[in-house]
Amino acid sequence: MYCRICPLAVMLAFAGTAFCQDITDLKLKNFRPVSIYNTPQTSVDKAKYPVIDFHSHDYPKSDAEVDAWIKTMDETNIAKSIILTYSTGVRFDSLVAKYSRYKNRFDVWCGFDYTGQDKQGWVAHAVAELERCHAKGAKGVGELGDKGLGELYSKPTPGYGLHIDDPQMKPLLEKCAELHMPVSIHVAEDAWMYLNADSTNDGLMNSATWKVDLTKPGILNHDQLVASLENAVKNNPKTTFIACHFANCCSNLGALGRLFDKYPNLYADIAARYAEIAPVPRYTKAFMEKYADRLVYGTDMGTSEKMYRITFHILETADEHFYEHDYFSYHWPLYGLNLSAGTLKKIYSGNASHIISE
């Protein structure tokens, strides 16, 4: 088989994950371009400033893995990680205990308890459980999650049919304000996931994996879900909200900017959307510099050193046309945003410190 650009070194580098394949047999899922541009590439081993990761989860399976995570955090300059558990009850209590050896390095957030939501009085029970979790150590609530059918990111009981702007949610959101518990919420998915999975979709492989089925009865679409978030933010001005993943408005950051302009109680994390924003560096940089006071760093991609360093590479450098196939399923080249020092300080930890100290 003949490949015009397929040196032995490239073949060896991708052994086991990809291979040189003739174009007549090439499948998009096997497309692993290697940049041919001889441009500077910067290695960023640790963040330029201390970081609070505002979007992480309960990845470790043992105390030893928690210890290993701490070591990685030390080596990459992650000062603290927010563990979004979705959880209440016994599960939440067990996670508080799991991370209690490193109280200054982890904040453990709870979920909402939707048990008995089809019965009268469930909200009072949910508020009581929220208060209990707070007393147990919960610093915030999240990650709530609604991809169209309701608040399904909850353990042990999902909130089918309940959207964040449902009147039944208001007592919970008001209690969050009273207890100074910020609310982290994922609404919708990015626009690619609502498009046809065909040759016109430029995020095809990733969008096909996460495609939203709008034929399901009662499901809300992207704009309806963002509207539900806006309603909740507007109707609960004393509650602090963090919209996960740029509110899934990566293809139209202006929509998020309009919300920032209207609602001072709204923030957004940048977790797990590096591959969506890095292909448009000038547009993204201008947005992030303008709204530097409203964005917080997040990962949502595990605990590896390489993962953290990829995020720093994108945020801190001006490097051009590189790929990270191990972490991102798109086929777009990535570009560094080269954010200013002031913006990095705010996104890495300044805004997060303000949110969790309010």
Q: PLM features: residue spans?
A:
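An N-terminally biased module of ancient metal coordination in phosphate/nucleic-acid-related enzymes
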Residues: 21-104
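Conserved, mostly hydrophobic/aromatic
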Residues: 55, 73, 133, 141, ...
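Active-site gating/metal-coordination segments in enzymes
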Residues: 22, 27, 39-42, 93-211
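Short, acidic/polar
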Residues: 61-73, 119-133, 255
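Hydrophobic faces of well-ordered beta-strands that scaffold small-molecule active sites
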Residues: 52-56, 80-83, 106-111, 141-143, ...
